[in-house]
Amino acid sequence: MQNFGIFFNPNYERTEPIFNLLKKLHKNKDLQFYNFPQQKELFPDFIKSIEKNKLDCILSFGGDGTFLRASKLSLEFDVPLMGINLGKLGFLSESSLSELEKSIDDLKKNKFKRS
């Protein structure tokens, strides 16, 4: 897996650490990140516009509501969805921002289950 769609809660204000980490992963691990049209204006330039045939997985940054909204995109693009919890409590998210790099490594090694 090299190509990740990025979907996040547009009301989340502390996006700089997220984008800094994604930029590091883009540069160091040769990962590509894509935005969705409904959130295009929220992203820095290194995150490209979505290319449907290139997407391997969607990363949802936020809470359970954001994850549920992103699940529609996961079905539309027929790719797995991984939730990155940005709050204190997230029942549907499998990872946190501090675990993101390891979680992506696990995805690349096919160490995940689709449910």
PLM region spans:
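N-terminal glycine-/serine-/threonine-rich phosphate-binding loop
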Residues: 1-62, 66-76
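Short, glycine/serine-rich, charged loops/turns that create anion-binding
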Residues: 11-12, 86, 96
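Glycine-centered flexibility sites
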Residues: 5, 62-65, 83, 87-90, ...
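Catalytic core of DAGKc-family lipid kinases
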Residues: 91-115
